[in-house]
Each structure stands twice: as C-alpha cells, then as structure tokens.
Amino acid sequence: MPYFATAGTGLIDAGNGKDTLSGITPLWSLNDNHNQINSQQLTIMARRKNADHGAMLHDGDGYMTAWFAYTLTADRDAAKAFTGSRPEILENSLWQDVHIK
C-alpha cells in the first residue's frame, strides 16, 4: 500500500529529541515506522520545518492533496512531487528528513 507520513519539527510533533515519550511524531518514530513498511508501492515520510502539529493541516496540504491525486487518480502532474529523478519534495527547502522508498 502507498504510505505518506508528515509531521512538523515543532515541539508538539517532534518532542525534545531526548525523551522517547516526548512529542506526537518524533523523528525516531517516523523513521522506525517508515523502515518497517514492506511495500512494493511508494512510501514517503517528511517533516515540515518550523511547523507544529496544528499548522500541519495547512502547511502540509499541498503535498497531501498531490499525494491523493497521484495515488488515487494517477495524476501525472501530482506524481512529479514524489517521483522521477528529482522529486519536488526533495528540492523544497521547507521540508527536511524526506525519505522516499
């Protein structure tokens, strides 16, 4: 199944980086979850810089919309955000810790 996980780097999402109980979606957890997925389809995780949990509804909307357009309707323009030799999300300086497999 396709998989796209997003989170922010703010304290509510990321936690303090030291306490494993801190944060809703700390980087270690995102990495662990993404690494455990065994899928033949596209899987992506990414964190939006300087955003926190509440902001991700609008800060992540463009990529989430493109993700659904690509995975549900095979929209070729939307696919460019995630596929090809230079996926747009990898070039976007507002995002970090982007992993595509």
Where do the language-model regions lie?
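Active-site-adjacent alpha-helix of alpha/beta-hydrolase-fold enzymes
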Residues: 1-76
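Catalytic active-site module of serine/aspartate enzymes centered on a nucleophile-bearing elbow/loop
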Residues: 59-101
